[in-house]
């Protein structure tokens, strides 16, 4: 049995388990990669700059609903919750990533709604969000999954809403 098959549970896509189990699904790697020096090294020293640019474009309109597609290592989610007073919905297919996000947002959890779901097939209503935020997601996706995510974003973002993509 291949090692990655141990991670094929709870709706985890095959490509994620096969190619990225070591980075996003294994508890020891989740702990390892969520250290600022590691994240900054992966991003060639640009993490803080990219985070600041992302936060500068986050929706601040009172009453807006934001969706952050997938958890990410680092401080995006807690920073986003401190930056805006809006409700932030955060979804990820990986339970370990959601647990990590929950631990980082305890002090602002009244505005953070966590949900376990695949970004390729969101369980949200049409036109549910004023802004959808993607922080380093697309480079991890195979082309067909990427297209499904594009389609889902178009479905859940309100007319006149925005999509904020930070990528390298």
What do the PLM-derived regions correspond to, one by one?
Residues 1-34:
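N-terminal, positively charged/glycine-rich alpha-helical extensions of SAM-dependent methyltransferases
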Residues 147-159:
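A short glycine-rich, Lys/Arg-flanked "PGG" loop and its adjoining helix->strand segment in the class I
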Residues 65-121:
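Class I SAM-dependent methyltransferase SAM/SAH-binding core
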Residues 42-62, 75:
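Conserved alpha-helix/loop element of class I SAM-dependent methyltransferases that forms part
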Residues 131-144:
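A short SAM/SAH-binding and catalytic strip from SAM-dependent methyltransferases
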């Amino acid at each position: 049995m291949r090692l990655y098959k141990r991670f094929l549970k709870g709706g985890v896509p095959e490509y994620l388990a096969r190619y990225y189990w070591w980075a996003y699904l294994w508890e020891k790697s989740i702990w390892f990669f969520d250290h600022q020096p590691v994240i900054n090294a992966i991003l060639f020293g640009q993490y803080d700059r990219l985070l600041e640019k992302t936060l500068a474009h986050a929706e601040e309109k009172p009453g807006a609903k934001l969706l952050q597609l997938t958890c990410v290592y680092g401080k995006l989610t807690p920073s986003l919750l401190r930056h805006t007073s809006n409700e932030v919905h955060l979804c990820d297919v990986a339970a370990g990533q959601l647990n990590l996000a929950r631990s980082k947002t305890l002090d602002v959890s009244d505005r953070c709604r966590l949900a376990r779901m695949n970004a390729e097939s969101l369980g949200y209503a049409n036109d549910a969000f004023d802004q959808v935020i993607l922080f380093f997601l697309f480079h991890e996706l195979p082309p067909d999954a990427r297209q499904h995510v594009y389609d889902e974003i178009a479905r859940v973002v309100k007319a006149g809403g925005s999509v904020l993509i930070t990528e390298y």
